[in-house]
């Protein structure tokens, strides 16, 4: 099995893990479950839960305690996309080739679906305490997700991103946005995998640095695709950054240099191994 086949196989397995933890669509309030499940199952690379599991395996983890955390991190990521697509933010109608949650279910349900996913993510993550593993590791993992998803992580980056709309920003501020908005959840994913497997503090710190570099390279690549891809290929509107008057690596450095930056940052991440 080559790399691409192995990746496809593990991604499919990860997809099934996430799916098993989604809420049952029943009860008087089942409309919110439908919107939540639609949001999660509308496609995606499942990069964060996949990285979490692979890091867990790398440090010798073999138990099932990782599974609810894998589902939880994907729910947190999805809620952020649902809210990012709202009219008050990027106002996108398509993501992953399908209607965004608010475009399909309405603005109010888009807000509530995102809220529901964030809350249900932690409800799901808490079930890791029932897996018979070290509760201190589980508690540490939950703290990591909470901080990296919150005002000192993803939300903090989103705030500065919103404030920067319509004005030019410098490289330092752009890197701050990218590290928090994109990098923080990737850091959380890999750190949680390491923590649950019993990695040392030094190893967890190294993993965090690697994930930070990966997150920056990932976001720059997304900047490039926003101006070079198509709606059909990318699954979401192109030129969204330009439409929303956002500064990106492409607007600062141009396409050629941005592509070189992706390669350089990716190589830089290897020094932490």
Task: Please place each PLM-identified region on the residue numbering.
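Long, acidic, intrinsically disordered low-complexity segments
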Residues: 1-17
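Mg2+-dependent prenyl diphosphate-binding active-site environment of isoprenoid biosynthetic enzymes
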Residues: 9, 13, 22, 26-269
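Conserved small/polar residues in nucleotide/adenosyl-binding loops
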Residues: 271-273
